A protein has these predicted regions:
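Charged, surface-exposed helical/loop "interaction arms" that form contiguous linear patches used
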Residues: 1-43, 48-52, 77-79
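Short beta-turn/strand-loop junction motif enriched in small, turn-promoting residues
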Residues: 25, 69-71, 89
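Glycine-rich/acidic phosphate-handling loop/turn and adjacent ATP-lid/helix
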Residues: 51-59, 90
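GG-anchored amphipathic helix commonly corresponding to the ABC/SMC/Rad50 NBD signature/C-loop
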Residues: 59-81
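Walker B catalytic acidic pair
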Residues: 85-87
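Conserved ATPase-coupling elements of RecA-like P-loop NTPase cores
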Residues: 90-96
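C-terminal lobe/lid and adjacent interdomain/linker elements of RecA-like ASCE P-loop ATPase modules
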Residues: 97-119
Length: 119
């Protein structure tokens, strides 16, 4: 029975991870005694390897956020505007079908709004 439950947990984790291009999820932690703990940890690409979300730099976190939102948007067929704060730290922003609103620090004395046409 324990082996069946472990295999089922792995299959669930694999099916969820298959929906994400680069983000990987750890949903279960196998215990020494054969038990299983529920967890929900995201691992994202950063510097050529996968690291926990909290250990990644801002650019990696922003792009992982976009990827997660893209997958959920596609699944539910709902595309809402995305707001990204601290985006001045991101050189390459992941593509999205949603409207993307980038908030960036500026030395300008007045609020400035710049628009770009969708590609």
């Amino acid at each position: 029975v324990e082996q069946f439950v472990q295999d089922r947990c792995r299959a669930l984790e694999d099916s969820i991870n298959a929906k994400f291009p680069t983000v990987r999820w750890k949903l279960f932690e196998m215990q020494i005694n054969g038990g299983i703990n529920d967890v929900c940890q995201a691992y994202i690409p950063c510097g050529g390897s996968l690291v926990s979300y909290g250990s990644a730099n801002t650019a990696s976190q922003v792009n992982a956020d976009i990827e997660i939102i893209n997958v959920l948007s596609e699944h539910y067929e709902i595309y809402l505007p995305l707001f990204a704060d601290n985006s001045e730290r991101v050189n390459v922003i992941a593509p999205t079908k949603s409207q993307f609103i980038s908030l960036a620090v500026s030395t300008d004395s007045e609020l400035k709004i710049e628009t770009k046409e969708a590609v």
